Amino acid sequence: MLGTEELIQIRHHLHQIPELALQETETHAYLMEVIGKMEQDHLEILEPEDLPTAILVRVNGTAPVRTIGYRTDIDALPVQEETGLPYASTHSGVMHACGHDVHMTVALGVLDYFASHQPKDNLLFFFQPAEESEAGGQRAYELGLFEGKWRPDEFYGLHDNPALKTGVIGCRLGTLFAGTTEVDIDVLGKDGHAAFPQEANDAVVAAAALIMQVQTIISRSINPVEAGVITLGKLEAGTIRNVIAGHARIEGTIRGLTQEMIETIDRRLQDVCEGIAKSFGVTVNLALNQGGYLPVENDPALTKRFINFMQNNPAVDYVETAPAMTGEDFGYLLSKFPGTMFWLGVEDDAQLHQATLTPNEGAIQKGIDALTSFITYRSQAEED
């Protein structure tokens, strides 16, 4: 079995070879190398042709009544690493700045344990590409990867959290992560000389009014005790100071803790865009793309069981956490299969997606121990 030091070395290697969504070829090869060294007696491995960097590993149980799924993500971010670590990224401009190297290492540790300790139930480990973008979970589902013996009856997954103490398990009933929608807005007016505004139609003025109007959606259309966010983080317009811009481009994101809230915000944004178009005589083209980034809604019964187990396990430090407005594409899979997502504390001053993120590696073994004990307990249960 993999020891703690071996697991840390695995994490270091994974950290050095980060790859972007759907490009995780080196990561895939290394994962297959590690998995190939495990005991194979009751393992089956699927490398799907239509999603070639994905890996599914089935652990056949001794007397299964269900298949317990566990998912980990394997892609990285377009971030230039600034940690100064001796095992820093060797791929320029790409970094495991969201801790997916930790996620993979924990998953490998849990898989290795059950490769050596055959469980009662079947287990399904899904090493998923393209979480940060390209909606890898949705792709996998729509490609039919979870059909037949590869279908989980329930799905679990974790995300590292630098705001929690090392090794802490955090979870909650209900929504853990927000759903997200990408927003792209093009405002089309008419360019012209700055000295003759009456002969042009200023896209910058219309875009500015649109941005200000959007700020009223959350404050006046959403219940104040519920959480919703619209951030318009990018505005591009114009080429020179004395030319009225005929085109402005706005990009942003919508976040909501329920699908209903996201759809409400989407509708109100459409209303605002239509109003600005009429008010300023411009064309406003709005594109909304949610893809597979639905809210991560934990199944009530399974999550209650998970929380009770963690609370009553003396080896686990458990805390209840608030919903997070960050997105996670595991939400799509949880819309198809009941399951639970939870946090693993990795205690660091840096936040997720920052170039200096350095997760505390003491969380790896603690995460593995908590998961193996829970999956063993769950596998022995006869009830649904």
UniProtKB/Swiss-Prot annotation:
Enzyme class: hydrolase
Catalytic activity: N-acetyl-(2S,6S)-2,6-diaminopimelate + H2O = (2S,6S)-2,6-diaminopimelate + acetate
Pathway(s) of this molecule: Amino-acid biosynthesis; L-lysine biosynthesis via DAP pathway; LL-2,6-diaminopimelate from (S)-tetrahydrodipicolinate (acetylase route): step 3/3
UniProt entry keywords in alphabetical sequence: Amino-acid biosynthesis, Diaminopimelate biosynthesis, Hydrolase, Lysine biosynthesis
GO biological process: diaminopimelate biosynthetic process; lysine biosynthetic process via diaminopimelate
InterPro entries for this protein: AcetylDAP_deacetylase, Amidohydrolase, Bact_exopeptidase_dim_dom, Peptidase_M20, Peptidase_M20_dimer
GO molecular-function term, one example from the UniProt record: N-acetyldiaminopimelate deacetylase activity
Catalytic residue list: D73, E132 (proton acceptor)
Gene3D superfamilies (alphabetical): 3.30.70.360, Zn peptidases
Function text: Catalyzes the conversion of N-acetyl-diaminopimelate to diaminopimelate and acetate.
Protein's name according to its UniProt entry: N-acetyldiaminopimelate deacetylase
Organism: Limosilactobacillus fermentum (strain NBRC 3956 / LMG 18251)
